[in-house]
Amino acid sequence: VTSDTQPKEQPEEQPEKQPILRAPAVVLVLLAALIVFHLLSVFGGNAMRIELIVALGLFPARFFAEGLGGLPGTWVQGVVTLFSHSMLHGGWTHLILNSVWLLAFGAPVARRLGPRKFMFLYMVCVMFGGLGQILITDFSGYLIPIIGASGGVAGLMGAAARFAFSDVRWLDPNAQEPRRRLLRLSEVPRRRPVVIFIAVWLIINLSFGLLGPYGLADPSGAAVNVAWVAHLGGFFAGLLLIGLLEKPPLSASGGPGHVDYGDWKNRK
């Protein structure tokens, strides 16, 4: 009689993938808000659309033109529109594209940061995107409103680039699933997948910036072109900011979660 004393290998458990329809509530609420504002601008009539654009759109004139370029409100409203312009879109294509990318990149970032830090990251990226766009706008474009969530969505892409291409290193105690290590900024240019992702994103963004029909809109609702600098400002804001918002957890070995156990042990 013989017996097999060798332990049988147990199949590795694969982490459950998170479908888009199970995106965190904060992402779905944000998406719903974008849709509601667009429905108001589309079905509320031309007068309401103009009113929304004047009230919420980001006009460079509110920052640089004498007398706010004749626009109503004060400079305070100009500051508010650095954020509120993200709620409006130039058309259904503009909204759908931003919605798809919001779900694709916003969901993993929201799971990682939680709702409050996610919204803070998103809105700061919206702001930096808007600032970048108005700073490169010349006098002839002062009264052309900048609208769209593209700066915030681009920021989520930049944030995701810091962890989407790293190795699975530790178990997230909250989600009970493997979590990818956040790359240090110094590692980003040394990771080929990250560099390729950023390079492809830049090429596509610049191409649409030169040729694309959406991103800016005049008061009549006609789209003009892509606010490509807003994309750049948001993307790189997200790439940098996520490292300030995420607190590295401790690994099971007691070392910081941003390094392998061997690395941590050797650094003690």
Regions found by a protein language model. Give the residues of each.
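A detector for small-residue-rich transmembrane helices and their helix-helix packing motifs
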Residues: 2-268
